[in-house]
UniProtKB/Swiss-Prot annotation:
GO molecular function terms noted in the UniProt entry: D-mannose binding
Localization of this protein: Host endoplasmic reticulum membrane
Name this protein carries in UniProt: Early E3 18.5 kDa glycoprotein
Keywords: Disulfide bond, Early protein, Glycoprotein, Host endoplasmic reticulum, Host membrane, Host-virus interaction, Inhibition of host adaptive immune response by virus, Inhibition of host tapasin by virus, Lectin, Mannose-binding, Membrane, Signal, Transmembrane, Transmembrane helix, Viral immunoevasion
Cytoplasmic-side positions: 158-172
Pfam families the UniProt entry points to: Adeno_GP19K
């Protein structure tokens, strides 16, 4: 009995026993849902609508295809009337198999809404008046954010307790 225990101990120390088995790494591509993508819309020109499609940052083998453009994980494309209202998401598994999902989305309604909202608030198409307003607003917001950061850094430096080594040694 003692000899068997010695042999098992030596096998486990040498890595030949079952005590040294490593669990398989979890592949995020196995759980990836090709239909769970994020779409963002913005006016690109007076007629085109910019579309940003993001899918699966955890899985590197995701390919998105729309209007003959293919890219990994994020695809920036444009939509206009006549362009297909679907995009394809394909995920390559660890065994080489490919899962494909053809997603149909209401590009026309979302782009119409984005264009309508930008036109309603005179944000699109750009004009001299709103470009100047945007530039001034951008400069003001940048100055405010910079001031907030400077105040925070100043407060961090001023409020931080300054204890010398002698004071630390006197503490109980």
């Amino acid at each position: 009995m003692g000899a068997i225990l010695v042999v098992l101990a030596l096998l486990s120390l040498l890595g030949l026993g079952s005590a040294n088995l490593n669990p398989l790494d979890h592949d995020p591509c196995l759980d990836f849902d090709p239909e769970n993508c994020t779409l963002t819309f913005a006016p690109d020109t007076s007629r085109l609508c910019g579309v940003l499609i993001k899918c699966g940052w955890d899985c590197r083998s995701v390919e998105i295809t729309h209007n003959n453009k293919t890219w990994n994980n994020t695809l920036s494309t444009t939509w206009e009337p006549g362009v297909p209202q679907w995009y394809t998401v394909s995920v390559r598994g660890p065994d080489g198999s490919i899962r494909i999902s053809n997603n149909t989305f209401i590009f026309s309604e979302m782009c119409d809404l984005a264009m309508f909202m930008s036109r309603q608030y005179d944000l699109w198409p750009p004009s001299k008046e709103n470009i100047v307003a945007f530039s001034i607003a951008y400069c003001l917001v940048t100055c405010i954010i910079t001031a907030i950061i400077c105040v925070c850094i100043h407060l961090l430096i001023v409020i931080r307790p300054r204890q010398s080594n002698e004071e630390k040694e006197k503490m109980p």
